[in-house]
Amino acid sequence: MNTIVDGLNEIFIQDAVIKLHNNGIINLKKWFVYKDNFSQIDAKFQNVLVHWRDIICSDMPDYKIRYICPEKIRKQLESNFDNYHEQIYRESYFTNISDVDFINIIDLLINYCYSLIIVEKIELIIFHEAPHGVYSKIMYDLAKILNVKTLVFFTCFGINRTAYCWDLSDIGIWKYNKPLINSNCNLNNIDKHENSVSNSKCVYNKIKKYENTYDWLFKHIVKNVSNFYYKKQDEYYKNKYFKYEFDDSINFVYAPLHVQPEMTTATLGGKYYDQLLAIERLSEIIPENWIIYVKEHPAQKDYRWRGKYFFERLSRIPKVKCLKNNISTKELLKKCQFVSTITGTAGFEAINAGKPALVFGHVWYSFLPGVSKYYDGISVEEIQKPFDNKLIDIKLQEMEKYCLPGIVLPGFLKYNLNEEKNHKDIMKFLMLVLSNQ
C-alpha cells in the first residue's frame, strides 16, 4: 500500500515505521519528519524524508511540482483558506510576510501535496496526531477529496491513551468493528509531561530553520517589537474588560477560552477555530436571565491572538461577563449550569464533576454521558438532560479496548518505555487495522 507517513519520527518509534515498510505492510513513499531527525533515521530511507519548509524554499529535484492542482479541487479547498492562513501565521518562520505571500505559500503546498499524491499513487496517509501545521492540514484535506485513506492517531488528553480514527469527524464516536488490542498498560506508569520543549536549545539550532542569520535577526526583532506592543495592548484590554467578580446567585454557563493558536481549535474546532463564534452561538440558546462567564486561559502567551477587536467583539456579545483571573475554576465548575467549550479538557472535568458539557468541535470524550455536541437548534433542556456520571468509568474502560497501548507522542507523555514492546504494539496495531481495509 503506497503510503505517506507524517511524523512518527522520534527515536523510540521510528523503527516501527521502518519495519512496516521492510515487511511489506506499507510501501513508504514519503516520510514527513523534523529536520533534526534526518540524521537519526536509517540512511536507506534518506531519499523519502521530507521537511515541510523545504517544500516552499528548496530547488532540489525531490521538491519539483509535476502537476498543478486542478481548479475544481482547489475550489473545494478554498473554504479552508482562512484555517490555512491561521496555521501559517503561527509559524515564526513566516514572521512579517505579506498577505499575498500567504496565498503563494498555500498554493505551493497545495500543488506539491497534490502532485505527490498523484505521482506516487498514494493509497494511505498516516498522521501521528490530528493534522495541524499548514502542510499537514492541506495534505489531509486533499486526501479526503481524492479518496485516499487517512489513519490518524489521537491522544486522549486526561486518560493518557492513544486512539485512532479514519476521519476527524469520527473523533469522539470511536465505533469499530471489534477491539484491536487489549491494553495491559499500567496507567500508574504514565504521567502527563508538563513541558515537552527543552529549554536548552541553543541559538544555533534556532537559527538553522531560517534562511540565514540576517533573516533570523530581522524576524526576531520584528517579532519582539510587535510582541511588546501586543502584550501592552493585551494588558490594557484585559484590565478593561476582565473585571467581573463571580456571583453564584445567578444561573450561568462557564465558557473558558482556549489557548491559540493550537491544534485543538485550528484543526479540531472546525469553523469554531473562531472561538468567539461559539460563544455567540451559546448566547443565542441560553435564557435571557442567564449569563456566560468567560475566563482567560492562563497559558495564553501569544498576544497577537487577543487583539483589540477580539476584546471589543467579546465584550459586546449579549449575556457575557469576563471574569478576573483569580476566580477559582473549581468553584465555577461546581456552581455552573453547564460548561461550554470547543474541544477543551474543561468539558471532561465538568462531566466528572456531574455537570453537563456542550462541545463545538471534534473532541475525544464526546461519546461520554453528559456531553452534547452543538448543532443549530439545540436546546438548553437537551444539554441539561440528567446523566449518571458513574457510567463514565464504564465507558472509558470500553474505550480502552479500542486504544493503542503503544506510545506515539512523547511530547505529551512521559513513560518508562520498553521500546521493543512499543514497536511490537505499534506493529501489531497497524497490521490488524490495515488488514481490515
Language model segments and positions:
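Leloir-type glycosyltransferase catalytic cores
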Residues: 176-211, 370-437
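Conserved nucleotide-sugar donor-interacting segment of glycosyltransferase catalytic cores
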Residues: 112-175
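Structural alpha-helical scaffold elements that stabilize or flank donor/cofactor-binding regions
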Residues: 118, 246, 314, 331-335
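Histidine-anchored nucleotide/phosphate-binding helix
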Residues: 6-24, 33-35, 140-141, 271-286
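Active-site donor-nucleotide binding/catalytic segment of nucleotide-sugar enzymes
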Residues: 246-276, 283, 290, 296-300, ...
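Catalytic donor nucleotide-activated moiety binding site of glycosyltransferases and closely related
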Residues: 280-324
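Conserved N-terminal ligand/cofactor-binding loop architecture of enzyme catalytic domains
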Residues: 18-113, 119, 158-235
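A donor-sugar binding/catalytic signature common to diverse glycosyltransferases
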Residues: 127, 131, 154, 325-372
